[in-house]
Amino acid sequence: MAVRPICIVGDPVLHTATEPIPVGPDGSLPADLADLITDLYDTMDAAHGVGLAANQIGVNKRVFVYDCADARKKTVRRRGVVVNPVLETSEVPETMPDPEDDDEGCLSVPGESFPTGRADWARVTGLDADGTPITIEGTDLFARMLQHETGHLDGFLYLDSLIGRNARAAKRAVKSHGWGVPGLTWMPGEDPDPFGH
């Protein structure tokens, strides 16, 4: 369908919990959801992302797509969509995240990355594009992606969970880029790739 602009930190749609996708009595999903899912895949692929939530393209609906390896530097990837995800995780460490192992970025915070504490394991239950119940789980990078994308749908960015010097560095970065205000976007495939892919 179409590559859409990606909202940048500060847009209210990124800081608001999304609305669940309605499910019909027969388990059917709205007909227009297929177009949204296609746009999410097209946009994620053009941006070279490992995941993309609907509110990142300005749509306040509880759905995300992913194309993510189980671990960093692995070539085998899992690709899919989760409608109305519910997240379950192991305990999140209370220690300061490791700058190398816990580095995390976001298409809505283009070109920046910060060490972010995440649970080592995560599971998401929800529906696939046809309304069939699914469960996906993983560790390492895949678990990080599940937590990151579900966080988006709950109205949070990974910046919200940063601590200490990482939180201060992120705040400075947002200010230096002029972000933190409504209406800012970037266009994958047209604007320079902020992560240099």
From Swiss-Prot:
The keyword Nucleotide-binding does not apply. The active site is at residue 149. It is an enzyme of class 3 (hydrolase). It comes from the Bacteria. One of its GO terms (biological process) is co-translational protein modification. Its cofactor is Fe(2+). GO terms for molecular function: metal ion binding; peptide deformylase activity. The keyword Iron applies. Keywords: Hydrolase, Iron, Metal-binding, Protein biosynthesis. SUPFAM superfamilies: Peptide deformylase. InterPro entries: Peptide_deformylase, Peptide_deformylase_sf. Its EC number is 3.5.1.88. Fe cation binds at residues 106, 148, 152. Binds 1 Fe(2+) ion. It catalyses: N-terminal N-formyl-L-methionyl-[peptide] + H2O = N-terminal L-methionyl-[peptide] + formate. PANTHER family: PEPTIDE DEFORMYLASE, PEPTIDE DEFORMYLASE, MITOCHONDRIAL. Belongs to the polypeptide deformylase family. Removes the formyl group from the N-terminal Met of newly synthesized proteins. Requires at least a dipeptide for an efficient rate of reaction. N-terminal L-methionine is a prerequisite for activity but the enzyme has broad specificity at other positions. This is Peptide deformylase. It comes from Mycolicibacterium gilvum (strain PYR-GCK).
